[in-house]
Structure formats: structure tokens, C-alpha cells
UniProtKB/Swiss-Prot annotation:
GO terms for biological process: protein modification process. The record marks 241 as: Lowers pKa of active site Cys. GO terms for cellular component: cytoplasm. Signal peptide: none annotated. It comes from Deinococcus radiodurans (strain ATCC 13939 / DSM 20539 / JCM 16871 / CCUG 27074 / LMG 4051 / NBRC 15346 / NCIMB 9279 / VKM B-1422 / R1). It comes from the Bacteria. Pfam families: LplA-B_cat. Catalyzes the transfer of endogenously produced octanoic acid from octanoyl-acyl-carrier-protein onto the lipoyl domains of lipoate-dependent enzymes. Lipoyl-ACP can also act as a substrate although octanoyl-ACP is likely to be the physiological substrate. Pathway: Protein modification; protein lipoylation via endogenous pathway; protein N(6)-(lipoyl)lysine from octanoyl-[acyl-carrier-protein]: step 1/2. Residues 93-336 are annotated as: LipB domain. Residues 124-318 form the BPL/LPL catalytic domain. This is Octanoyltransferase.
Length: 336
């Protein structure tokens, strides 16, 4: 593999050549993200979610998302790059202050090591990086996880399925990563602004999902992550979680990040109690498309929507490292 393929580039908003549509089933090695890629129409679904119904209910009293204290994020509609109410669009953001590197399909230990390399660089003033990656099937245990408590199968069964388990330093409980899930590791300076940073991550995902045609995406007060409208199944209402979030802060810089279910095999979430939440079901963009008659989604569409949303959400972010004493750390306790 050419060494240049692993190097990040400045996140520019100029139009790049249009690559062919790429589905979740077709992967390449680590590659630079091409913005304004063509909207792939190759089907991304894996047959999950048959027969579910969605009532279109939206719980009242949800707070408006903010990208800073007191600053409301513009409401978005499914049309890409168009903000309602005259809000700023991605084309107005000349250059983001972070790099974007697409690592393709990469085993979890290698991605974990890459995060730490990027952290060491950012901690001494290097340019922040957003790592995009998919993982082979794997379970990770956050700081809240008790050994095996929310894993509902034996380690022997997981080993037979080729699913590894790793204890990591992020906040939260157990979660699943696998093909069809877009994982974004935001190696950004944070310091003590952990809660504000988590809200910004949520806002970026909400904006991306709005661009993809899911305007009901929203945070869930009291829990980290992003949800769509709940569904009633067999007389019980279940929250529908589409994106998990869990971070750690070391040397004032964030590790880990988000896992957005694009066209994930949702059956694998049956191996665990996701994030330890018994009244929550995991969903995906493709499942929501199936239920709403929206066709199919590609991983490239999701990457484009998410990176555009990050550029907008973090356009006014304070990228300086806060004045925290050397060697001091803060670890978040975010639900994955």
C-alpha cells in the first residue's frame, strides 16, 4: 500500500472528482475521503427490521441542540447542504480546522493504536484529526462495564463467531462494532469541556441524519447518543438508538467517539444489552429507510453527510488546548 494512502489531508470544501458509488459490501484499504462524492445507490440493507412499524411519535419537551452554550444549531432538512432559516451551509465554511482520514475496514486493535498516535501528536499542538473507520465484528467494554454483565452469550460462543472483546478507556458500558457501522474517532482538543464536546458530537450526528432524510433524529436527555422516534412493540415502547457515543479524554485530547449504524447487521446487538439499556432497541439508517420507503443508503453517502456535519458543527469551535496542569487527565463517563 502506498505510504501516501495513509496520510491525512486538509479537509477542503472544493469539489473533488466524483468516484463511483460504493456500497457497504465493497471496501477498499485506507483512503483519503473524497468530499462531494456521488450519492451511491447500491443497496446497503442486510434484511434487518422486517415488519416493524413506526408511529411517528415525537416526545414533547426536547431541548433544542446547541453547538455552544446558548447558540442554537440550525434546523436541517433532507436536502444536502441547505440550512433552513438562512443558516450557514458547508460551502460557507472555507476550510475546517481538522483533517479527515478514512481508514476503511480496519481491525479494532490497529485503529485503537492509530488513535493513540494521533492523540500524542494533537496533544503537543498538532492538527486535529477525524478518523473514519469500519471494524470487523467486535465488542468493546467501557469503564462502566462489569465483566460479562451485559454480554448475554459466552466468551466461547463469541470466539467461535470470530468476535473479540476489548476493555477500553472510554466511558460507558458494552457496545458492538461491525461492518456497516460508521465509526468516527474525533481526536480533538477538549480539556475539561467534556459535556459540551459530547453535545457537539450529538449535534453533528443529528445534522448528518437530517441530511440523509431522518429529520426525527435527536439526542435523548439523560443518555449520550442519538435516537429516532420510539416504537411500540408488543405493547411496550422502545427507544430507537441509531448512534452510540463514548469518549475518553487524555492529555486534554479526546479518544474514541461515535458509532453510527448505517447498514449494520443489527442481529449482532442481540449478543449484548447495548449500553446496559434494557428499554432500548438498536436501529440503523437502512432499517429506517426500509420502514419509511426511502430506498437504500451507501456508506459513502453517510461519510459525506457526517464529515460535512462535523465541519458545520465545529466551525466556531475553540481549538486551543485549555490551561490544564501538565499530566492532568479527565475521563468522561458517556454511555456508548
Amino acid at each position: 500500500m502506498p505510504k501516501s494512502a495513509l496520510m491525512s489531508s486538509s479537509f477542503q470544501t472544493s469539489v473533488s472528482p466524483r468516484p463511483l458509488p460504493v456500497s457497504c459490501a465493497s471496501r477498499t484499504a485506507a483512503r483519503k475521503l473524497s468530499l462531494y462524492c456521488s450519492e451511491g445507490r447500491t443497496r446497503c440493507g442486510m434484511g434487518q427490521g422486517k415488519g416493524w412499524r413506526w408511529p411517528g411519535h415525537r416526545p414533547p419537551g426536547l431541548p433544542s441542540p446547541t453547538n455552544r452554550v446558548g447558540q442554537s444549531v440550525p434546523k436541517w432538512r433532507p436536502q444536502p447542504h441547505k440550512a433552513a432559516g438562512g443558516g450557514r451551509t458547508i460551502r460557507d465554511v472555507k476550510e475546517a480546522a481538522f483533517d479527515v482520514l478514512d481508514l476503511g475496514l480496519l481491525p479494532y486493535p490497529q485503529a485503537w493504536a492509530r488513535q493513540k498516535q494521533e492523540l500524542a501528536r494533537v496533544a503537543v499542538g498538532g492538527r486535529p484529526t477525524l478518523l473514519l473507520v469500519e471494524h470487523p465484528a467486535v465488542l468493546t467494554l467501557g469503564r462502566k462495564a462489569q465483566e460479562g454483565e451485559n454480554i448475554v452469550v459466552t466468551r466461547e460462543y463469541l470466539a467461535a463467531q470470530g468476535i473479540d472483546v476489548f476493555a477500553v478507556e472510554r466511558g460507558g458500558d458494552v457496545t458492538y462494532h461491525g461492518p456497516g457501522q460508521l465509526v468516527a474517532y474525533a481526536i480533538f482538543p477538549v480539556g475539561r469541556r467534556v459535556r459540551d464536546f459530547l453535545r457537539l458530537l450529538e449535534n453533528a450526528v443529528v445534522t448528518a441524519l437530517g441530511t440523509l432524510g431522518l429529520p426525527d433524529a435527536r439526542p435523548n436527555p439523560g443518555y449520550a447518543g442519538v435516537y429516532v422516534d420510539p416504537r411500540e412493540i408488543n405493547g411496550k415502547t422502545y427507544d430507537q438508538k441509531i448512534c452510540s457515543i463514548g469518549v475518553a479524554i487524555k492529555q486534554n485530547v479526546a479518544l474514541h467517539g461515535i458509532g453510527l449504524n448505517v447498514c449494520t447487521n443489527l442481529d449482532h446487538f442481540d449478543l449484548i444489552v447495548p449500553c446496559g439499556l434494557t428499554d432500548t432497541q438498536m436501529t440503523s439508517v437502512q432499517r429506517e429507510y426500509d420502514l419509511r420507503g426511502l430506498g437504500s443508503v451507501s456508506m459513502e453517502q453517510a461519510k459525506k453527510a457526517l464529515t460535512d456535519a462535523f465541519a458545520l458543527t465545529f466551525a466556531d469551535y475553540d481549538w486551543s488546548l485549555p490551561g490544564v496542569a501538565a499530566g492532568q487527565e479527565a475521563l468522561s463517563v458517556a454511555s456508548p
